[in-house]
Amino acid sequence: ITELTSLLSRRSLYCSKFPSSEWSAYQFPESKPQGNVIYQRIQHTWKEGKCLYCGASQNEYDRGEELETHAYQFIHNFDVKKLCNMKFDVIIGNPPYQMSDGGSGTGISAKPIYHYFVLNAKKLSPRYLTMIIPSRWFAGGKGLDEFREEMLHDKHMRIINDFISSKDCFPGVNIAGGVNYFLWDRSYNGECEIRNCANNTKTIVTTRRLDEFDVFIRDNRAISIIHKFLKSGDKRLSDNTFTRNPFGFISKDRGEESPIDGVDCIKLISSAGEGYVPISLVSKNHNEIGKYKVIIGKVVPCNGEVDTNPQDGYKVTTSSRILSPNEVITESYLMLHTFDNKKEADSFAKYMALKFPRFMMKHTLSSMNISTQNFQFVPYLDYKIYWTDEMLYERYHLTREEIDYVESMIRPME
């Protein structure tokens, strides 16, 4: 908690900011002036410009006494049991979600911190633990890989209530990927009950293993379709795509307005348009420069589609674009695949515009950002063939009900 929230909490609990005062609904002794709502101002522990405990940026949070440091005592220690020298039957919380880490060179990069609260709360071994947190840990999130693995293998996870739209919990608040609240039960050991909640009216419930995949598939209705793809033995597109920043150009790179005289230049595609750079500046994937490349934007369109009405369907990705030989990209884009001829590149670009591949992507997304792992359930096929959704539905033996679900969830690509 911060100083302000500690004062507000005491006023709510005791009708007084100072529980040892005569105005407190329950008067604590002078030795406990804060009652049971303890606040102690502490400082971050800086190492190489970051807090050792929460990863906050020193430039942002190395502040004077007049400003809140947001160095939350509950997570700024190595032994939370010594801090909380008491037993807890129940822990309930809505922890802080993130703090600026000074990354990206813009000062707006943020690092999740909510998982530290969850992990430390577990260390206290309460009978029950429930917290509401962003759902980005399901399949992504900066620095959340170990946390995701720990949560997916925790057999004490009894219930996850998943809201794909954060506004169903927090009206007017858009959190890309939605939010969830979970019940962790110390005495429980088994599969987890997953509740898909949408529009405050519809809840789809199933009980299943959390660790079936290396990411959490939140949509209960998608599981059977994913199983059918995996049973087919077809390759995964994730094993054949390129990682971010395939040529070594960061998002801010723009190049020159025209080719440089006397220099072997290639075209650079950035979020600002087109420029020209010396081919010598390409730092990796040199063999791909002369090929046709199929690219998409690296983020989910429309601010993560947080305002999309599910009845209208989701796009999931931007439209695919084909780049010619001697055209490269900055890390504002993802390079999905390269081809020696334009016909196969065109076939693949049209394939990625189909509903089925985007449906299979959709269930691995929990934030605005797209990465290689989001293609792990997208089939990698022979692109000498021009595929259709109908061909894919037949290939993976989808039922009429499953086909209708895919068709209703994903909108046509313009």
Where are the model-predicted features located?
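SAM-dependent methyltransferase catalytic region
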Residues: I1-I159, S165-C169, G178, F182-E191
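Class I S-adenosyl-L-methionine
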Residues: I1-Y26, S31-K32, E60, N374-E414
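C-terminal substrate-recognition regions of SAM-dependent nucleic acid methyltransferases
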Residues: K82, M86, S166-R400
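Hydrophobic alpha-helical segments
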Residues: G103, Q311, R411-M413
